């Protein structure tokens, strides 16, 4: 599998936002949040950090994104998405196996109900270290 990684650009903002919104719609407890405020915050976060995001391509086709950055003495894996039509093809596993090569501790937030993602992270040595809120775990490796 030949994956190509490119720094994301402004033209990617909307696609990343749509993936984020889809995850929020699927896994967030929407009745207990200010939905519009959360979506505005997510969009601004992506827009303000777009050049820290990485676009993942397979055969010149965009298949996903991730935001992996240093946070003090750790690394945070934030916004790791593979488009649904490309899931279960080994892409997420390949990307994750490359990202975990760092010596630093890596942490991430994952929706409690996102069992597929949790299982993937566990296969690569991540463990749930605490519940962040009702809907999210913090996992660490």
Task: Tell what function each PLM region has.
Residues 89, 93, 139-141:
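Accessory recognition modules or surfaces
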Residues 108-119, 134-141:
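Conserved beta-strand-loop-alpha-helix junction that forms the acyl-donor binding cleft
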Residues 85, 102, 124:
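Conserved dinucleotide-binding and phosphotransfer motif residues
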Residues 7-13, 17-79, 83-85, 96-98, ...:
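Acetyl-CoA-dependent GNAT
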Residues 2-5:
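Extreme N-terminal starter segment of soluble prokaryotic enzymes
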């Amino acid at each position: 599998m030949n994956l190509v990684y490119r720094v994301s650009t402004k033209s990617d903002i909307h696609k990343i936002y749509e993936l984020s919104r889809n995850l929020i719609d699927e896994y967030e407890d929407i009745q207990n949040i200010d939905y519009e405020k959360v979506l505005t915050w997510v969009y601004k976060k992506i827009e303000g950090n777009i050049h820290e995001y990485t676009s993942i391509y397979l055969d010149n086709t965009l298949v996903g994104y991730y935001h992996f950055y240093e946070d003090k003495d750790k690394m945070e894996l934030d916004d790791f998405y593979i488009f649904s039509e490309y899931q279960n093809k080994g892409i997420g596993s390949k990307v994750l196996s490359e990202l975990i090569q760092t010596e630093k501790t890596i942490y991430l937030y994952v929706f409690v109900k996102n069992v597929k993602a949790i299982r993937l992270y566990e296969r690569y040595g991540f463990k749930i270290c605490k519940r962040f809120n009702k809907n999210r775990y913090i996992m660490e490796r």
